């Protein structure tokens, strides 16, 4: 049963349709979208989810958090191949940062630590314990980095289990401050909630914006942190974006971008990852007011703003990146949606290279026996039904009809060129 659930949990709405006895596989993004052009696909190792990415522009290396495999993957972008995998990390890696001045990759880990990995040997050389270390209900996830101050601001979330359905706790989350020069924890800022999902920092290093995924009295909110005081100085309700999960910033025009899921990551398996549409909410950082809210792709997990082009890259776990355009600071429009890959939940826009990168984990591609308008929803429904299957049902030969034919698509890195 565990194997069945694991298989079903990774089945996505990428499928092979049968027509007149022929099997025709429809793989993600084999064409030009008019927004991004797929120019290269690089094989990647490992199973399971991957998380955030970071880049060494000068050395032409990309680093990928192998979340499920507890690894860090190093890719040579010039050669188009993986050059090293750092395995055996202490927990799941989440948000990495490449520090060019020390040639290190610093990454947050779900055991409430931050690790430094040497850029030459690819070995872990330093580990900083955060405030949640040793507490199974707390773990580090998203983070922001201030290169001028050499400080990492790591979000430590509170995660509890209620009868098999994971939910974030109501308080005791924090932003922990790590000095990368001394490899020391130098501060901890208490947050008004349990889920610091999205974190972005002003280039000046004066303010940090944290989108809190907690729903309090019907609203989610942004916690505004004064980094000199190291305290929350404001809380702004996010209308139009019920479950915020990521954040980006246009500091020149005082605009905060919030990527939201439309339902919490609880209850039925799939949770907020699979619900369409998601929401992009634009907020004024001078007033805290919502400027605009637009439909986007589901399962918001990453969001980046490119000042040179005025584009917003909104990445969802539904295997799509939505591109928005800043017409002016008060008006934004959806340019289009580009397929990335199944459960490719994050991506990285690199302005210096004018390229977008999407890491697609190894996943199952389904052969549908019958036509369906929403194969992914059907699979998730079967997964939830499968949770209730008893040993007696299993002995009687119960099985899910959706597992009749499976094709495995191996993990890979998709490399896209910018198109004006």
Model-derived regions: residue spans:
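Predominantly soluble domains enriched in secretory-pathway, periplasmic, or organellar proteins
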Residues: 19-420
């Amino acid at each position: 049963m565990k194997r069945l659930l694991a298989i079903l949990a990774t089945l996505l709405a990428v499928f092979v349709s049968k027509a007149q006895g022929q099997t025709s596989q429809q793989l993600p993004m084999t064409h030009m979208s008019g927004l991004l052009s797929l120019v290269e696909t690089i094989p990647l190792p490992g199973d399971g989810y991957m998380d955030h990415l970071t880049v060494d522009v000068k050395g032409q290396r990309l680093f990928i958090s192998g979340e499920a495999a507890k690894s860090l993957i190093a890719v040579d972008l010039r050669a188009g191949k993986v050059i090293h995998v750092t395995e055996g990390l202490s927990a799941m890696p989440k948000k990495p940062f490449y520090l060019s001045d020390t040639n290190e990759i610093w990454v947050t880990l779900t055991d409430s630590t931050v690790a430094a990995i040497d850029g030459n040997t690819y070995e872990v050389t330093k580990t900083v314990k955060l405030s949640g270390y040793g507490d199974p209900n707390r773990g580090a996830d998203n983070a922001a980095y201030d290169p001028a101050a050499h400080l990492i601001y790591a979000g430590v979330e509170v995660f509890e289990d209620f009868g098999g359905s994971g939910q974030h706790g109501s308080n005791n989350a924090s932003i922990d401050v790590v000095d990368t020069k001394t490899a020391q924890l130098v501060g901890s800022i208490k947050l008004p909630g349990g889920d610091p999902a999205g974190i972005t920092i002003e280039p000046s290093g004066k303010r940090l914006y944290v989108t809190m995924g907690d729903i309090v009295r019907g609203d989610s909110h942004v916690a505004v942190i004064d980094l000199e005081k190291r305290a929350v100085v404001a809380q702004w309700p996010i209308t139009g974006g019920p479950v915020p999960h990521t954040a980006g910033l246009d500091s020149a025009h005082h605009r905060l971008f919030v990527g939201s899921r439309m339902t919490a990551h609880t209850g039925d398996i799939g949770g907020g990852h699979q619900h369409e549409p998601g929401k992009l909410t634009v907020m004024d950082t001078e007033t805290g007011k919502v400027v605009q809210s637009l439909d986007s792709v589901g399962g918001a997990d990453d969001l980046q703003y490119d000042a040179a082009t005025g584009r917003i890259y909104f990445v969802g776990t539904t295997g799509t990146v939505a591109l928005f355009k800043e017409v002016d600071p008060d008006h934004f429009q959806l340019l289009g949606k580009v397929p990335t890959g199944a459960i490719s939940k994050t991506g990285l826009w690199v302005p210096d290279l004018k390229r977008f990168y999407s890491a697609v984990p190894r996943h199952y591609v389904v052969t549908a026996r019958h036509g369906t308008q929403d194969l992914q929803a059907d699979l998730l429904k079967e997964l939830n039904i499968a949770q209730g299957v008893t040993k007696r049902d299993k002995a009687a030969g119960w099985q899910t009809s959706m597992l009749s034919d499976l094709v495995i698509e191996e993990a890979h890195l998709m490399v896209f060129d910018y198109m004006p």
